[in-house]
Structure formats: structure tokens, C-alpha cells
Amino acid sequence: MACCHHLERHSTTNPNTTTTALTLVPPPFSPTPSPPTSACGDCWAVSAVMTATDRWCIAHNQTTNPRLSVESMVSCCKVCGYGCADGFPNYAWHWLAGQKGTPYGIPTGGNQDDRRWCTKYTLPFCNHYDTVNDTGLPSCESGPPDKTPTCPSTCDNDTTYPTPWAQDNHQFSSAYAVPADETTIMTEIYTHGPVTAGFNVYSDWIHYPVGTGADQIYRPQGGTEMGGHAVRIVGWGESKGMKKKYWWIANSFGEKWGLGGFFKMAKGVGAAGIEESVVAGLV
């Protein structure tokens, strides 16, 4: 099953030429959709693991498309931070690449009702902030945060996945920081696929795209700072007419939030520090 199709108007231009990526990158790709969300503070793991899922698919020329396990990262990577109580995307990438004394690799894992992979995501789903609530899910902010689940050591009993746990270990060869430079980040995405990034969350971002104007590009407008958040930058573009540049970013609040789970962030102007903490890795 191929991971993807092209990114439509997002990330279609080589950052160093005027030639389109759709003619230069065989074959063009689109990012894995944002998974449903829970009340676990695991954005650090979701952003890193979904970036890794995309990069695995791209590196294998879309001949293999495993969904890597967010829950295994959250529950097993003790050096990454505090599980559901926050963590660090750069250490998640160290875990994937076996750097800094961490184990090496990650198994596959799907959503709660997905038996195609080794493990399932066991935490209950909920809706964050202004997510369109047409599913009957509770608000993630209405109750206590989820506790970090137990690190699995076998595949689920009801899985249809044929690969045993010991062999279901997807390993990356490297993990690294991407310099805080607009063109360098674009080149990294163009060459290898999406990247993981952190930024400062302000209260006006929570209600995205409310208040962003016709172009729907988020620019901090002086709201209250609420802490950090990790996301997956999957491409870039320019608004029609106004020619304002933006990053096209996958959030971790599910497909009912923002623009189908994605949002636009002003590019090249240091908006919310989005270009300052970018990390990635190679298969």
C-alpha cells in the first residue's frame, strides 16, 4: 500500500530552483494523516513517530508503509522525558536511531480499532480545544490527563500482523538537528521528507483558524504563552494573491481540528520559534 500521493500545492517547489518537486521527486508524496488524539501529553512522540512513519515510506520508495507505534515511544522511551506528562522530540529521534545510550528502533502500531499492526493505541480518544465535535467524544481538557501506559513487550493478542515482536523493529541510521534556516529546512523536507519541530503555543493559536484572516496563516498576535508544542512540518506554500509564505504543518489533535488536522504558520519570520527546534533522521 503506497503511503501517499502528491502534496497538491504544498511543498511543490525545489527551494533552490524554479522546477517543481512533482517532476523531480519520484514519486511525489503526501503526509500520513494526523491520528486521533487523547488526553496524554504525547505531542513530542506523535510528531517524531509520524515524521518517522513518513520518512520510512519515502525512503523505501513507497513500497512499504508501516504505521510506527506512538504508544511504544510514549511508554518505553524513559530517556525521552515523562511519557504522558511531556517529553522531548530530539530524544525520541535518538531512540529511533539508537543514539545517546538509547535502545534501537520501534515496532508498528495503529489506532484503537486497527488490528493490522503489532500494537494498538490504548488510550481513550477525546477532542482538543476547538475540534469539530461531531463524533460524541469528550473534551480532552474536561478531565485529568491520561497516565503513561505500560511499555509493551509483545504484539497484541488479537493482531493480524504477521511479524513477531522481536522482528518488528524499525531502525533509523541517524538523528540530527536541522539548522534554524528557512532554506535549509525546505531543502531537508524536499530531499528526505517531513521534519519534527517545536514551537511556543500562544492562546490565540488554540482556536485556529479563527483570527488568522483570509489566508489562514497563523502569526502570533500577543496572546498568553501556554508552553511548548511539537508538530510535523510537511511542506510549505504561498497564499494566493498576497504571496505570504507559510509552513504547512500537521498537528496532533486529529483530523477534526484546524484544516483537516493541519495548519499554516508564517514562514521565514521566526513565528513562535517554529524554525528554531527542528529535528529529523534518516532510515
Residue ranges and their predicted role:
Residues 1-283:
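Catalytic-core signature of thiol
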